[in-house]
Amino acid sequence: MLAAMGSLAAALWAVVHPRTLLLGTVAFLLAADFLKRRRPKNYPPGPWRLPFLGNFFLVDFEQSHLEVQLFVKKYGNLFSLELGDISAVLITGLPLIKEALIHMDQNFGNRPVTPMREHIFKKNGLIMSSGQAWKEQRRFTLTALRNFGLGKKSLEERIQEEAQHLTEAIKEENGQPFDPHFKINNAVSNIICSITFGERFEYQDSWFQQLLKLLDEVTYLEASKTCQLYNVFPWIMKFLPGPHQTLFSNWKKLKLFVSHMIDKHRKDWNPAETRDFIDAYLKEMSKHTGNPTSSFHEENLICSTLDLFFAGTETTSTTLRWALLYMALYPEIQEKVQAEIDRVIGQGQQPSTAARESMPYTNAVIHEVQRMGNIIPLNVPREVTVDTTLAGYHLPKGTMILTNLTALHRDPTEWATPDTFNPDHFLENGQFKKREAFMPFSIGKRACLGEQLARTELFIFFTSLMQKFTFRPPNNEKLSLKFRMGITISPVSHRLCAVPQV
């Protein structure tokens, strides 16, 4: 009898046990996920979330900056999103953005380190570092940039020289259709190369071209849905093939390139004669030898150099590409820019920032390109450093903060014609007018440290190109303002005709 009952129990257990175990495991995981993601009291509202994934499939990563505007309309100027384990809050509107990034900047000063960023950079570099390490790296880099000409005539002359190389390269196209992408990338990148590596590269240099292509590819890949899925399930995705593996491989190659440049510098390094950023950093590292807590170490040198290289190339070159595209699409605006250049500079003199004050229209056009180009649409993310209250909502420590620059730069209460390319937004009585709602370089203590360099580059490169060429659409080709979503928003691949000025 007992044997029969035992056999029956064993048979029932064999049938029930796997299912019960599976259901119990799923129920436990769902309960754990629910408790983990339970919103605290007064947390900003947001859309309904799926277990484990959060709002991942509600976001179209090909146009995420536009998708979130629908949530703004539904949930207001402070709303939340969950992307896997990442809790994010989007801030919209000038008053709230200023409150967070200026008046409460000490509470929003860190950078969030996603699983993808952790894999690539950990907490090193200039862009994604936080706390004392970030303060030390930023202070050192600003000093180094000033020592190598930032804000001085020497660096401006370097930009003018590179602008000549760029105009010569474009002149070789003989007015025929060409894609300006990598010619512009070459020129802009050479400025930061001269600062970091102490040398510029020829536009035909195959090694340099490969470097720029790797940089372009990581810019695009990092914002893709597959790569973002790595941030949700890193422990699974790291074993699977896909674009995220290409991304990691490309960053590894870029790091090897910088390591090679550092090794070259070490061979003939003279502490008494600092040639460039790498030399300056090696000198600073030598002061902290034997200090395990110092932020000045080789991995930070590699990551900081890559940050300078990326930020110093991608943002400015993308803005210039938008500028030429807008000029080809708005020939009447291009003519006004050229008329101002002819009047103030002429054809025989090289453009310089000394002429900027006398060229309000050209300056306004550059600013309008930045507004409409909107290349960093949700700003570089911040992270809440301590439990904080903003606009009556509770933001726990560790929450990712995104600032809605897309809505700000298209706000109808701030701009007369928000969806139209209109340089008059930056003009008043014929003079250039600064706008508080314009912040392509962000604001506060974590604003872009290369803003001054970028403004100089944009003005000199743009005016040099407008001085020498008229940009037009190729015959039988229609230009559009369609964009490619990546870390930045860039124009889709297109061709232009650069007709030399007579």
Swiss-Prot record:
Catalytic activity: (5Z,8Z,11Z,14Z)-eicosatetraenoate + reduced [NADPH--hemoprotein reductase] + O2 = 5,6-epoxy-(8Z,11Z,14Z)-eicosatrienoate + oxidized [NADPH--hemoprotein reductase] + H2O + H(+); (5Z,8Z,11Z,14Z)-eicosatetraenoate + reduced [NADPH--hemoprotein reductase] + O2 = (8R,9S)-epoxy-(5Z,11Z,14Z)-eicosatrienoate + oxidized [NADPH--hemoprotein reductase] + H2O + H(+); (5Z,8Z,11Z,14Z)-eicosatetraenoate + reduced [NADPH--hemoprotein reductase] + O2 = (8S,9R)-epoxy-(5Z,11Z,14Z)-eicosatrienoate + oxidized [NADPH--hemoprotein reductase] + H2O + H(+); (5Z,8Z,11Z,14Z)-eicosatetraenoate + reduced [NADPH--hemoprotein reductase] + O2 = (11R,12S)-epoxy-(5Z,8Z,14Z)-eicosatrienoate + oxidized [NADPH--hemoprotein reductase] + H2O + H(+)
CDD domains in the record: CYP2J
Classification via PROSITE patterns: CYTOCHROME_P450 (PS00086)
Gene3D superfamilies according to UniProt: Cytochrome P450
One biological process term in Gene Ontology: fatty acid metabolic process
Compartment annotation: Endoplasmic reticulum membrane; Microsome membrane
UniProt-annotated binding residues for heme: C448
GO annotations of cellular component type: cytoplasm; endoplasmic reticulum membrane; extracellular exosome; intracellular membrane-bounded organelle
Top-level lineage group: Eukaryota
The protein's annotated pathway: Lipid metabolism; arachidonate metabolism
UniProt KW keywords: Endoplasmic reticulum, Fatty acid metabolism, Heme, Iron, Isomerase, Lipid metabolism, Membrane, Metal-binding, Microsome, Monooxygenase, Oxidoreductase
Membrane-protein topology: Peripheral membrane protein
A Pfam short name: p450
Cofactor: heme
Molecular function (Gene Ontology), one example: heme binding
Enzyme Commission number, as recorded: 1.14.14.-, 1.14.14.74, 1.14.14.73, 5.4.4.7
Tissue: Highly expressed in heart, present at lower levels in liver, kidney and skeletal muscle (at protein level).
Cross-referenced InterPro entries: Cyt_P450, Cyt_P450_CS, Cyt_P450_E_grp-I, Cyt_P450_E_grp-I_CYP2J-like, Cyt_P450_sf, Cytochrome_P450_fam2
PANTHER family in the record: CYTOCHROME P450 2J2, CYTOCHROME P450 508A4-RELATED
Similarity comment: family membership: Belongs to the cytochrome P450 family.
Task performed by this protein: A cytochrome P450 monooxygenase involved in the metabolism of polyunsaturated fatty acids (PUFA) in the cardiovascular system. Mechanistically, uses molecular oxygen inserting one oxygen atom into a substrate, and reducing the second into a water molecule, with two electrons provided by NADPH via cytochrome P450 reductase (NADPH--hemoprotein reductase). Catalyzes the epoxidation of double bonds of PUFA. Converts arachidonic acid to four regioisomeric epoxyeicosatrienoic acids (EpETrE), likely playing a major role in the epoxidation of endogenous cardiac arachidonic acid pools.
Name used for this protein in its record: Cytochrome P450 2J2
Source organism per UniProt: Homo sapiens
Name of the gene: CYP2J2
